[in-house]
Swiss-Prot record:
The modification Phosphoserine is found at residues 279, 691. This is Protein moonraker. It comes from Mus musculus (Mouse). The lineage of its organism: Eukaryota, Metazoa, Chordata, Craniata, Vertebrata. Residues 582-674 form a coiled coil. It comes from the Eukaryota.
Length: 959
């Protein structure tokens, strides 16, 4: 808490001006002017800073001295246009203010609750006997005293400064708080009994309201289902998205409903366990109130579950959930039996019977919902057999009516249809309609039941756990138990017995006027077995005086006492008592049989539902086993089929590899034969040239200058054709030899590899197939890369033509082909086609020149070779674009700069730039230079050889 800061100056508003001061302009003041009071005394309490805990709300005011107060009064009396002292304000912290608001709200709620209790107690009817009148008057007076004590009008006091202060005075010995639910630690006395009885009545009325709400909800549910069965629902065709949403919503509703049913089942189980622990004779007030509140909460949960079920039923139409409906019906039935067992209110058994009948009607209606033609007929039969709560009963559920009015309503609405009711329902209703006169007769004659009860039933009274559940099936008036307990502890007054005999006489007169119901008349004269078993009675006492041996010194008994004892215990009374006992035994056996029959009838749906659930579980387990077997069989068949397919593929692959190996060896042999055939004439030529060179080498030293000068013109004439004849022959011979040797070595390498693969494939065929597949994948990847690197101008007509060609010629790889986008890029440069040079053996010496000329002519003719089909298709599919020269120049400059940049930094192929291709071109150039050097040397050798041949021939001719 912060420090409380008192105000050092006081402010007030001048609301109006005085009429007499209007003439003086100096005294004129504007309206609503702020005026500051500087005459506040310098009291240390006004200026000190104090710290305090928020124990209570304190209204602190500024204090004035006595003289200043009197002086202010004189000023107020003399001058009316000025205020001598302003209104004093106090400083209150926010925490204190919020706490005060909280307390005020609590007081308002308490006052509203007590007013509601007063109105409820005033609306309750007065009972017929005087005891109830006195009790109600005592309750009203007590409630009025409590309200008067707790809500006295606050006394308003005016301070000297004019501030209004509300002072609340509390009376000692009075408390606004209600009596707690915990048991007292000492004897509270008789003054707290009316408040406890009032709380009991409130809890009982609360439980009755919840039961009646459940009854009303059940009747509404039956009406809605009946309306749905009467009208035909047409299913509309929905979109797939809408159907999916509906399916998801239904799944969520099913999960929510299952969760609610599980929670309700746990609540019912806990309530049943607690009620089994509680003894029917000695139920404490706190435990009973706790049980009533738990029952009310369970009833509210059942109402919510019933509303969810009705919503699902109206949404799904012809697809109800019968298992959940049966489970909910059994839970509501158990709740109703628990409320009847607790005996919270006398009218609870009537409502419980109605709820049980409504549950039976609902279950039978839902069972016959699948056959719409029989539904209407079935529901009319159900309504005739079990009258569901009618409109009058539903209209009166929020208000609590007296027992006499409730009895008249029940007799009006249910007894005309007794002809169609089952006999057990008749007996239960007859037991419910027992009047108060019978209870008063039991009050006035507490020993009648003790006399009617047989000695054999005494051990059953002590062991209540066995017959307590059966007693709930035939509920009786719970006030008989309480009144019996009260009369057993208090002496019976004569006045009360006389007053209780009067309604009993009226009851007998009313029963004489109804001769058509002899069974109910006999039933009304006796109590039920459950009520007698619930009564807390002492063991049977013999009212006769115990036998005392006569004392010779004692005086003899008086004749009056002897005659009284003889008259009281006459044989006629003994016979009458024996006949009454026999009649009680007969009725008890009959009632026990009826109770067992009713218990069997009520437990039949639970047994039937459990039986059906077991059957459903067995069917589900069988279905799961069947599905599992089918799945395993399918898996076995699939695995066997796939293994067969793999074996077939393996065999096919082995056959293909064998064929490939055979074809490879055959191809290698053919290539070797062809190479040998081509090499034989070349070797013969080489040998001839070599022999001629060796034969004419010794003639190089012999030629003379004369011979050389004479032979010079002839040499010039014959040198050119000889040179031109020998050099191309040697060059072609060397090239052919190199190519054939390379092809032969490659074939040998391939043959060795295939043989090694075939040898390995026998051991590991899977590895061989994997390697072949990887090679195919690499080839396909290379084709894809070439396709993407290939830059063409394409159009849809070309695509259609290519698709037709692809359909006509099946591809080797069945992989997916890329799409054909429109590309505007640069085409790759085409290499010049290789020129085939054919060497033929000359027929004579002069034919070499002709062959040379023919070869040159053939080269000229073969230079413009026709393009392939692919090039023709590309040219047909190309689209020419007109590009300005400046733009073309800028594009070329950019490409050159980019290639120069790539030459500096790049080591991989990017676009059209390929460093390895450049390296290969460099290597080709180097090889060409080397070949040129070799050719030059060979040409020199040939020149020397020609010179030697010329000299030899010239010398021979000269000689």
């Amino acid at each position: 808490m912060g420090p409380s800061q008192p105000a050092s100056t006081c402010v007030h508003l001048a609301p109006s001006l005085q009429l007499d001061a209007m003439s003086d302009p100096r005294n004129l003041q504007p309206q609503n002017q702020l005026q500051f009071n500087r005459n506040v005394p310098t009291n240390p309490r006004n200026l000190a800073v104090r710290y305090s805990c928020p124990h209570g709300i304190k209204i602190e005011k500024l204090k004035h001295s006595y003289n200043e107060l009197n002086h202010g009064k004189d000023l107020d009396f003399k001058a009316g246009n000025e205020l001598s002292s302003s209104v004093s304000f106090s400083v209150i912290s926010e925490e204190r203010l919020s706490y005060a608001v909280h307390l005020a709200k609590r007081d308002v709620k308490r006052r509203q609750f007590e007013e509601h209790v007063k109105d409820h107690l005033r609306s309750l009817p007065h009972s017929s006997h005087k005891g109830m009148h006195t009790k109600v008057e005592r309750k009203d007076s007590k409630s009025q005293d409590v309200c008067h004590c707790s809500h006295q009008p606050s006394r308003v006091s005016l301070s000297s400064s004019g501030a209004k202060v509300y002072v609340y005075t509390s009376q000692p010995g009075r408390s606004d708080l209600t009596v707690p639910n915990s048991p007292p630690t000492h004897d509270p006395g008789l003054q707290l009994q009316p408040r406890i009885e009032e709380n009991k009545n409130l809890w009982e009325q609360k439980g009755l309201l919840e039961v009646q709400r459940l009854q009303k909800e059940l009747s509404g549910c039956i009406r809605k289902i009946e309306a749905l069965t009467k009208k035909d629902r047409l299913e509309e065709a929905l979109d797939p998205d809408e159907e999916h949403r509906i399916r998801v919503r239904r799944q969520e509703q099913a999960v929510r409903c299952a969760r609610m049913l599980y929670v309700l089942q746990q609540q019912v189980k806990e309530i049943q366990e607690e009620l089994d622990k509680l003894s029917p004779q000695k139920i404490k007030h706190t435990k009973k109130s706790w049980a009533v509140s738990r029952l009310a909460a369970a009833h509210r949960a059942a109402i919510r579950a019933l509303q969810v079920f009705v919503t699902q039923f109206t949404d799904r139409g012809e697809h109800p959930v019968p298992a959940r409906c049966r489970e909910l019906g059994s839970l509501i039935r158990q709740l109703s039996l628990c409320s009847a067992k607790l005996d919270a209110d006398p009218s609870v058994p009537d409502v419980v019977i109605d709820i049980l009948q409504q549950i039976e009607a609902l279950e039978s209606l839902l069972e016959k919902k699948l056959s719409p033609k029989k539904a209407k007929k079935c529901f009319t039969e159900i309504r005739s057999r079990f009258p569901v709560g009618s409109q009058k009963i539903l209209e009166r559920w929020p208000t609590v009516l007296p027992k006499s009015e409730r009895r008249h309503l029940v007799t009006k609405e249910t007894f005309p249809q007794e002809t169609s009711r089952p006999p057990v329902a008749k007996r239960l209703l007859a037991a419910m309609c027992q009047p108060d006169g019978e209870l008063q007769r039991l009050e006035s004659e507490p020993d009648v039941l003790d006399a009617h009860l047989l000695p054999e039933e005494a051990p059953r009274i002590e062991d209540n756990g066995t017959d307590f559940k059966d007693g709930t099936l035939t509920p009786a008036k719970p006030q008989a138990v309480r009144r019996k307990a009260l009369t057993g502890s208090m002496p019976i007054r004569k006045k009360d017995t006389v007053e209780s005999a009067r309604p009993q006489q009226g009851l007998h007169i009313a029963e004489r006027n109804r001769p058509n119901q002899p069974y109910s008349k006999s039933r009304l004269q006796q109590t039920t077995v459950s009520s007698r078993l619930k009564m807390n009675r002492q063991p049977m006492k013999d009212h006769r005086a115990p036998w005392i041996p006569p004392n010779p010194t004692s005086p003899p008994a008086s004749p009056k006492c002897a005659a009284w004892m003889k008259v009281k215990y006459s044989p006629r009374d003994a016979a009458k008592e024996q006949s009454l006992q026999q009649e009680d035994i007969h009725k008890e056996s009959q009632l026990r049989g009826d109770a067992e029959q009713e218990a069997a009838r009520l437990s039949w749906p639970d047994a039937e539902s459990s039986k059906r659930l077991k059957e459903l579980e067995e069917l589900e387990a069988k279905e799961m086993e069947r599905k599992q077997k089918q799945r395993l069989n399918w898996l076995e068949a699939e695995t066997s089929r796939r293994t067969k397919e793999l074996d077939e593929l393996k065999a096919e692959e082995m056959d293909r590899l064998q064929k490939l190996s055979v074809s490879a060896t055959q191809l290698a042999d053919k290539v070797e034969e062809a190479v040998l055939e081509r090499l034989k004439p070349l070797l013969i030529k080489a040998q001839r040239v070599n022999s001629s060179v060796e034969a004419n080498s010794h003639l190089k030293d012999r030629p003379s200058r004369h011979a050389a000068a004479a032979a010079q013109p002839a040499e010039q004439a014959s040198d050119v054709p000889f040179e031109s004849r020998n050099i191309p022959q040697l060059r072609d011979c060397l090239e052919d030899t190199a190519h054939e040797l390379w092809a032969r070595t490659q074939d040998k390498i391939l043959g060795s590899e295939t043989s090694a693969r075939l040898g390995d494939s026998k051991d590991s065929p899977d590895l061989e197939t994997m390697m072949l597949r990887m090679e195919e994948m690499e080839k396909y990847q290379e084709t894809v890369r070439q396709r993407y690197n290939k830059i063409v101008y394409a159009d849809p007509h070309l695509w259609m033509h290519e698709e037709r060609n692809d359909q006509n010629t099946p591809a080797v790889s069945e992989g997916p082909l890329a799409s054909h986008p429109i590309k505007i890029t640069k085409t790759a440069t085409q290499k010049c086609p290789a020129v085939n040079i054919l060497l033929e053996r000359p027929c004579n010496a002069n034919s070499l020149d002709e062959s040379v000329t023919t070869e040159e002519g053939s080269e000229k003719r073969e230079a413009p070779l026709p393009l392939s089909r692919e090039d023709l298709h590309q040219r047909k599919g190309q689209t020419p674009l007109s590009v300005p020269p400046r733009m073309r120049h800028s594009i070329g400059a950019y490409c050159s700069r980019f290639e120069q940049f790539l030459r500096i930094i790049a080591h991989e192929a990017i676009g059209s730039f390929n460093p390895w291709l450049i390296a290969e071109s460099f290597s080709d150039e180097l090889v060409d230079e080397a070949l040129g050097a070799v050719a030059a040397e060979l040409q020199d050798v040939c020149e020397d050889y020609a010179e030697a041949v010329f000299t030899s021939e010239f010398l021979e001719a000269a000689a």
